[in-house]
Structures are given as C-alpha cells and as structure tokens.
Design a protein with these regions (language model features):
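Short, well-ordered coil↔helix boundary/capping segments
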Residues: 99-102, 126-129, 221-226, 468-478, ...
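Transmembrane and membrane-interface helices of multi-pass
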Residues: 2-217, 666-668
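Extended, solvent-exposed polar beta/coil surface segments
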Residues: 1-26, 656-659, 694-710
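Serine-centered coil/turn micro-motif
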Residues: 14-15, 25, 222, 353, ...
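Solvent-exposed soluble domains appended to multi-pass membrane proteins
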Residues: 259-265, 273-276, 281-710
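Alpha-helix initiation and N-capping motif
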Residues: 129-132, 220-224, 247, 295, ...
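Membrane-interface segments at or immediately adjacent to transmembrane helices
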Residues: 194-273
Length: 710
C-alpha cells in the first residue's frame, strides 16, 4: 500500500505541483516568436483541426481529402470559424491552456459526430444534446452501449485531469497586455465578421442556409459550420410578408374553398394512423433480392387500397420530425438545421394538430407506443398537440423483444389499440400507433437461426447479415399489419387506417439505390371497411392526414383545411408561401389566424387506458417479503411508501414484492408507473394502508402467498 501512495505522490509532484524552472534564452526566443506570429499559427491549427474533425466524421482520410478538394472554400470557411474561436486566447494569460480547451472542444464534438454516424445516418446536431439524458436512461436499446459509455467517461476524465495539470504547470504569458482595448476590439471585429462572412458564403453557394438532406449537407459544407448552424439557426425565420392582412388573405382564400364537415364524434369513422419504424419495401431497393416476399400483406393492401410515395423530412433517423409533420400538417423545411420542434418550440407553445382538430368535433384521441414516454419529450409534445391519452411502454405488460433484444415486439400494440376503442364506446376514435420492431441498429453478425427470409445482391458479409435481419423484421411488421386489420374487421365500426414508413433504415442507402431515385421517399398504404375508392397519390408527410380526413368528410383545422384546399394548386410557390405564413403565425407569431386567441390549448394528457389499483397487501410467511396485489402492474410499476420510492420486484401483472424492512405499520402504499428520470406517469387509483401482522390489531390481515399467475 505504501508503494502505491509513493507512486501517487510522484504523479502528484510531476503533474500538479508547479516548480519554478529557469529556461534558456533559446526557449524565451521561441516563445516570443510564437507569440509574435500567433495569428498565423492559429490559422494553421484551425485548418488542421477542421481536417482532423472531417477525418473522424467521415471515418476516412481519403474522404476528408476529397472534401478539401471538392469544397475548398467551404473548408476554408469552416477553418475561419475555428480561427475566430482561437482569438479568445488573447483575453487570457494562460494562452496555451486556452488553446488546448478550444482544440479539445472542436475535437470532442468531431469524435461525438463520428460515433453518432457509426450508428445512424443523421449527423450530430445541437438538438441531440437535449436528447442525451433520455438516451442514457433507456434500457434495451442500441443507442448506447456500456463500452461506449465507459470510453466516453474515461476519455473526458483523462482530458479533465490533463487540463488541471496544464493549468497548474503550463506556460503563462508574462508580457504586458498594453493594448487590451485593441485586443478586445480586434476580437469583437472577428466575431462581428462571422454573420457577414456567413451571409456572403450562403449567397455565393459556398455553404447552404437550408439542408434538404442533413447528412449530405454535413458532407458538402463541413461539420464545424453545420453543427454551428444547428446552434444559432433554430426556430423559424419571420416571413418578409408576415402581417395581419396577409394572414387574413390566406384564411379568406381557404374559407372560400373549404367544405363543411359531414360527420362528428358519434357518426364519424375511427381513424388509425400507424408509423412503421424504418419501414422500406425491399422491392424499392435496386440491388437487393429476397428469396420470397417478406411483406405480402403490405403489398396486398397497396394493390387494393389508396397508396403512394410519401416524402419525409429525414433519412435513417429523426422519427419525431416525420411524426411532427404528419400530426400537425406543418413542414420541417422552415425550421433550423437538424432541429426537433418537440425539443424546442413545443416545450412552451401549444400547437394545433389532427388530435385537436378531431377533438373539436367530438373524437377521442389516443397515442399507443411501445417505447419510453419521455423519449423525444413525447409526453409533453402530445399534450401540447391536444391528445387525450398516451399509452407508452411504461403502461404496457411487455414480455417479448426483438431477436437482438433491443426493442419490444409490435404485436402488443394490437390489443393496446383495441383498448382505446373499448374505453370510448360512444365516441369515434383517432388512434396514432408508433411501432419499433424494425428499428435499427441491425446486427452485422448472424442473430436469427435459420432465417425464413434470406437476401442476395449484397457483397459485404456484415451488411448481408444486417439486411437479412432487417427483412425478417419487416415480416414481423407485416404480421402486425395483418393482425391489426384482421382485428378491426371483426368490429362493427367504420374504420380507416393509414400506415407509412417514417424514414428509410440506417443502411447507407443512396439515391441511386432506390427505384424512386430519392432516399427521402417512403411508402404509405391504407385500409378501410367502408368501401372507399382507391385513389393513389404521392404526398408529403405534412399532407397525409389532410388527405385522409378529406376522404371521410372531415374538414377541420386551420392547417388541415389549408392543405385540403391548396395542396393540388398548380402554383407550388404560392402554396409553400402560404404554409410558411400560417406556420409562423401559429408557432411564433401573433396568431392572427385565430384572431389572437388560443383556439387549441394543451390537453390534460392521461397516461394509459387501464387503471392501476391495489387490492391487498400481505406478508410472506417464509421470508422478509411483503406482497402487493392489484391490477395492471407492469415492469415499470414502482412501489412508493409514504410518497418515497422503495426497491420493488415485478412478479406479475397482479403482484409486486418489496422488502419487509422498507415498510412499517400504518404506512401508506402507492403503486406508480415510472418512466425515465423517475417521471411518474400514473398513480394507482387508491392508496393502501399497511397493517403489520406482528403488531396487535383488532383484526388480522391476510398472509397468503402469491403465485406467479395471480
């Protein structure tokens, strides 16, 4: 032990104890030279950092060289941004320390981007920082592994220790800062130059102000600029023609053409919208061949019911943004680079959606999703959109997972959807279903033994395994579609279902790989039991539900009516300008289209359909265990004693167990459904007062042993 302490003391003396040291004249001349030409060295270092970051992001030295060659001016502009950040060192005496911090900042961001791109197509952006707590809190997913988390923690820890040592023992500028005012003025000039040079670069097409393809944008214009734009370019820009009169003109145009709704919450059909996670028809991929059709139900519905291509705003990731467009009718093209409105504007602003529109005519509105309720801040977002209920995985008795163990299977969503219908027998329902079974990452090692569906046309063995896994999961999604439509066919209720892929899978697909020629095109299909005619159309995600409701006689809401009356206009520019105007007015403007009032306030969202209750509590006769009996417990049911959570074990949907030492006679017991970050989504309908059998009472409590099936 003494030797260990001796070693630690040596390290401490070497790294963290500053000793005066006499340097040679040559050393001081070198320092003076570096200080004199520091701007030149900053420029060189800035270019080196940008090049290294591009190597990391592209995971290829050759690709980084091609970027510099093909987009030289963009490379220089990225370097200029890093160069400006280095000018901050002139405000400090410990300039070497400041340079290391700035270098580390950009390099760490580049490393994070490289790690992100190894698991998805969409690069790392500012909004991802807000998702990190939720990602880290998720279990049974492939967003983060224990190994990755360990590397990140140790890497940051080592860098922090190095910074401490450098701060203590590193060089310090000893010259007189005689021109502090000039330095600050020079620094201010550089930072003021950023928006000016950015505007020039955008106007000359050196870089772009909007990325229709985020991944391609990062490739073409560099990580430093692209990430920086996600930091400063958030929200919507105010349209130049935004004013009350122009908004009223758009509204008047819509009102003169819109139709009258012919149904209500008692006579209208049930509407089901299904987001099929990462769903892609294998027939759409030019190089891929499958031994037999893995999605026969999908193709049968595509043949017999209305269907078409769906233009979505993301590829490989970003489900929430396709979802946002589909539910609200608003377009992501007017937001900042890589933005998630769920994580920004919807944090504080309510937003008209299909749910609030249908609620106005008496519909009950629901969301069913077999993943965490907090992910993408969905619980908040669905409330802001006006939904009545949200059944997330925390409210489901999930027992089955996909072959790689990452995601719950989707079959449970059928019964959960039927619960939403049964809960409102005298109302029509809108139920939005979000699947996860086909979610990436797709393993490059064989996972499924003797797979039913095999692929060819893929040379790389790892990618062949990934495609094999994916097409077999597509078959599971197809089975879900059949089970859902079969179950709906048994019910004597008019129903229309629209199903769509939110984006293509994370498989590195290019436009040339797709029959559509566009990696931003997925497919949608429909089903109904009402005899509606087949009317195929290619749509944008923000038009999908306007089209669906139009076919069943529902013409509600500012945005949905706008699409229904204007989406087939021959003047595409006018159509997009009107959408931009209304979208800004609703989210960021004065809501002239609502006459300045809040027509669609946030709802009091209820988590889940099933009520959780406690029916009995008893002590074990053979161990220090207390059993809690009730209904609708799940793996996310947690026991609270006097409003404080205690360790508990899930035994079945009717039994939970806690340790005897955590409870005392007279304590109040509550069961809560708990999400990430200890968010309580729902509490049991009742509390139960614990009666300790070891304490004398007027009557004795039961001490029956539970069974696993209870």
């Amino acid at each position: 032990m003494k030797k260990i302490f001796d070693v630690l003391n040596v390290i401490k003396q070497k790294l963290f104890v500053k000793k005066d040291k006499i340097h040679s004249e040559k050393y001081y001349r070198r320092i003076d030279f570096l200080n004199k030409y520091s701007l030149l060295f900053h420029a060189i270092i800035a270019m080196a950092i940008v090049f290294i970051v591009e190597i990391i992001s592209r995971r290829s030295f050759i690709s980084a060289c091609k970027f510099v060659d093909a987009h030289t001016l963009a490379f220089m502009y990225n370097s200029f941004l890093v160069f400006v950040s280095f000018s901050l060192v002139y405000l400090f005496r410990r300039r070497a320390f400041a340079r290391v911090i700035i270098t580390g900042f950009w390099t760490i961001l580049g490393i994070i981007n490289g790690c992100v791109l190894s698991n998805r197509v969409t690069p790392f952006g500012y909004t991802d920082l807000k998702c990190i707590p939720e990602l880290l809190a998720m279990n049974n997913t492939s967003y983060f592994t224990a190994q990755q988390a360990t590397i990140v923690v140790f890497g940051l820890g080592a860098f922090a220790l190095f910074l401490v040592a450098l701060f203590i023992k590193g060089p310090k500028y000893t010259g007189k800062i005689r021109y502090a005012g000039i330095s600050v003025a020079f620094l201010a000039l550089l930072f003021v130059a950023i928006p000016v040079t950015t505007n020039v670069a955008q106007n000359t097409n050196v870089v772009a102000s909007y990325y229709s393809n985020i991944a391609q944008g990062y490739d073409d214009y560099g990580f430093v600029y692209s990430f920086s734009s996600t930091v400063v370019d958030r929200g919507m820009k105010k349209p130049e023609d935004y004013n009350k009169q122009n908004v009223e003109d758009v509204e008047q145009k819509v009102n003169s053409q819109k139709q009258t709704t012919t149904v209500d919450g008692k006579t209208g059909p049930n509407i089901i919208c299904v987001l099929l996670e990462s769903f892609c028809d294998p027939d759409e991929i030019n190089f891929l061949q499958v031994n037999e059709d893995p999605i026969p139900t999908f193709h049968e519905l595509e043949k017999n019911y209305s269907s078409g291509y769906l233009n979505v705003p993301v590829v490989g990731a970003g489900t929430a943004n396709t979802e946002f467009e589909m539910l609200t009718g608003l377009s992501m093209q007017y937001f900042g680079t890589g933005e998630y409105p769920y994580k920004t504007i919807l944090k504080q602003t309510d937003c008209e959606s299909i749910a609030s529109d249908l609620s106005k005519i008496g519909y009950a509105t629901h969301v069913v999703h077999n993943n965490g309720g907090n992910f993408y801040s969905r619980t908040n977002a669905f409330s802001k959109m006006g939904f009545d209920t949200f059944t997330s995985k925390e409210l489901m008795n999930i027992t089955e997972y996909t072959p790689n163990g990452s995601w719950p299977t989707d079959d449970i969503l059928v019964s959960e959807t039927m619960k939403t219908f049964d809960a409102t027998p005298n109302q029509s329902d809108f139920t939005y279903i979000i699947t996860v079974g086909t979610h990436g990452d797709y393993p490059k090692e064989p996972v499924i033994e003797n797979p039913t569906y095999t692929v060819s046309g893929v040379e790389d063995e790892g990618m062949k395994n990934a495609w094999t896994y994916y097409v077999n999961q597509l078959n599971e999604a197809d089975r879900f579609i059949k089970e859902l439509t079969d179950e709906l066919s048994k019910r004597d209720e008019d129903t229309i279902v629209v199903m769509f892929g939110d984006h293509l899978p994370t498989m590195g697909l290019q436009n040339s790989d797709m029959k559509s020629g566009d990696i931003y095109k997925t497919k949608y299909i429909t089903w109904n039991n009402m005899g509606l005619p087949k009317e195929d159309a290619d749509l944008y995600a923000y038009q999908l539900l306007a089209q669906t409701t139009d076919t069943v006689g529902i013409h509600e809401g500012t945005i949905m009516n706008y699409h229904q009356t204007q989406m087939n206009s021959t003047d595409e520019a006018s159509y997009q300008d009107g959408l931009d105007l209304l979208q800004y007015d609703i989210l960021y403007g004065k809501r002239y289209c609502y006459n300045g009032t809040d027509l669609y306030p946030a709802s009091d969202l209820v988590m889940g359909i099933d009520k959780v209750d406690i029916t009995n509590v008893s002590d074990s006769s053979t161990s220090d265990t207390v059993y809690i009996y009730g209904h609708n417990f799940t793996n996310w049911s947690k026991v609270y004693i006097n409003d404080s959570k205690v360790a508990s074990t899930y035994l079945s949907a009717g039994v939970l167990a806690i340790n005897k030492e955590d409870i005392s006679d007279g304590d109040e017991i509550t069961v809560c459904q708990v999400g990430s970050s200890d968010t309580i989504f729902r509490k049991s309908e009742n509390t139960y007062t614990y009666v300790d059998p070891a304490v004398e009472h007027d009557s004795e409590s039961e001490t029956d042993e539970p069974t696993e099936n209870q």
